[in-house]
Amino acid sequence: MWSLQDSIFTCERNHEGENIIHYLCRNGGVIDLLTFRNAINDENRYLLSEYNRDGKXCMHIVVSQDKVDPINKLMLLMKWGADINSKDQKDGNTVLHIAVLTNNYEVAKWLCQQPGVDMEIINFARKTPYQIACDRANTRMMDLLXKNGARCDVPLKINTARRRASHDYGVKLIRMGESAR
């Protein structure tokens, strides 16, 4: 009988630029992924961190695409060594950012409870998952994140901060080259 245990996968990709694990994360179930459990060894572990043409690794694909059983897929991928805090190449979003953006409360809650998850990590827009929830006025997601330990900091726009400082504290802002009157 043929075994995947000692197999080494080549770098072949499908027409969408996906390796076999990307494909199974998008189109397969947990059972399909489990078929490859013995094949994810030191020689093949790179498949978990490879990016497809959309700039997503396997974890990002699961959170953004799987509506059936994402948590069990994520558990399996993490057991194999996938990074819970890896950022996609397009927006710098982690799986927690994506769960917030897609209003996936169940996955967001589960991710928040995982050891090693960085709830304060910022994407390329310099936003934490909590700040994204705040920008979208998603109070349910904001509450979920806060209850699971997210810092509830929302940066003020620079002009808003200046106006508040000058109004609330009597601070006069002076431009370079001007003198205080």
Curated annotation (Swiss-Prot):
UniProt keywords, alphabetically: ANK repeat, Host-virus interaction, Inhibition of host NF-kappa-B by virus, Repeat
Pfam family, one: Ank_2
Organism: Microplitis demolitor bracovirus (isolate Webb)
Entries under PROSITE patterns matching the protein: ANK_REP_REGION, ANK_REPEAT
InterPro entries named among the record's database cross-references: Ankyrin_rpt (IPR002110), Ankyrin_rpt-contain_sf (IPR036770), NF-kappa-B_inhibitor (IPR051070)
Biological processes, Gene Ontology terms: cellular response to tumor necrosis factor; symbiont-mediated suppression of host NF-kappaB cascade
ANK repeats: 54-86, 91-121, 125-154
Source taxon at top rank: Viruses
GO molecular function, a single term: NF-kappaB binding
Name recorded for this polypeptide: I-Kappa-B like protein C2
SUPFAM superfamilies: Ankyrin repeat
Entry's family note: Belongs to the polydnaviridae I-Kappa-B-like protein family.
PANTHER family named in the record: NF-KAPPA-B INHIBITOR ALPHA, NF-KAPPA-B INHIBITOR CACTUS
Physiological role: Suppresses the host immune response through NF-kappa-B inactivation. Possesses ankyrin repeat domains required for NF-kappa-B binding but lacks the regulatory regions required for dissociation from NF-kappa-B and degradation. Therefore, prevents host NF-kappa-B release and subsequent activation.
